Amino acid sequence: MRVALISTSIFALCCSSNVRAEAVLPVNPSPYLVGAITRNMFRVPKPDQDLVLLSAHRGSWEVYPENSAYALQDAWNSQIEAVEVDARFTADKEVILSHDYRMERESTGTGFLYDQNYSQVQQADLRDRHGRVFKDSRGRNAKFMTFSAALDLLAQYVTDDGHGYVMIIDVKGAVDDQDPTDPIELTQRCLDILAAKKNPKLSKAVVFKLKAKDAVDIGTFLNRTTYDPNVMGGLIVVENPDDQNVKDSNYDPHEDTIYDQWNVAPFPVQFEMNQFYKGDGLQAYLDYVDQKQGFATYHESNYYPEGVANSAGKCCFEHNTDPRSVAHGGIVPDYRGEPEMAIVNRTNLITTDWPDVVADMLRQLGRRNTSKLSR
């Protein structure tokens, strides 16, 4: 296995894109310490805590294209302490940032990302959330970013004295039988690219996010990659990767052996859940008194038409949502876009497409004391 990892590392170093990221917006210095961000991210949440962290999902893409350099910088320049980006392979194993595995919704390109080389992908221009081809005030289009370029962009915010922001990497797996992506291989490639930067402070600003249903999955991840919890910023586990995983209202997390496994993990692990509707049994875990690890929630935004675009770039993704709701026109409503549902929960981190709105809500509730991130 170690030989395989070394081979992967050599491949990554010789084949990764050499294009460095240009700052498309001004680089405003961060008032936050990276160590303070990750420390608060992975502590045990308390009902009376006065700081809930925010992660801008795919950056700030109200105006800018999602997962673009513009979206990342706009979030950081707005002093949102973390952004979450999506990592995928192209056909020639370049790691790029893209939520979808089809190109049409996000860009002027067509077809599957895993069928196209990076040089082909770079011919496409990114769209904004309304489907319009993006141009900035200087007439520049936005392009798909490589993971390497995203790291270079983050590095411009990470300083020698420890200030900076955090980037969370959501590693995407295979989406169909034709997609050859192995999420472990993709994660290792990301680790190789990061290691090649030879920047320990940058490594501490990167958090990986993966799907895992139990401790066996985590063990597989640790055995098959060079991930080192002493080097990286941290690890977030998506506990409910199955969109049908909605708990009954009488669900008792104290009887769930999976959560007991997370509680005894030998290093900090934060696990994240999508809460599907108010009263979902997952709410019980948010108030779980025996919780010993960090906890995060995510809610999606219901842009018109109602629903959430899936990774094929199609609308709408039929989640198993509130059984009391009634679907209209064949679309199953998805109520996770209500930020009010997330801010009342006991959680360390909220990943949101509305970081500015949720930040204001938390501030009004006395739960956005970001002065803690400066010490």
Swiss-Prot record:
Pfam families cross-referenced by the UniProt entry: GDPD
Supply one GO CC term from the record.
plasma membrane
For this protein, the record's InterPro entries field holds: GP_PDE_dom (IPR030395), PLC-like_Pdiesterase_TIM-brl (IPR017946)
> Sorted alphabetically, which keywords does the UniProt record give?
Plasmid
SUPFAM superfamilies, sorted:
PLC-like phosphodiesterases
GO molecular function term, any single one:
glycerophosphodiester phosphodiesterase activity
* Limits of the GP-PDE domain: 52-301
Indicate yes or no for the key word 4Fe-4S: no
Name used for this protein in its record: Uncharacterized protein y4eD
Q: Which organism is it from?
A: Sinorhizobium fredii (strain NBRC 101917 / NGR234)
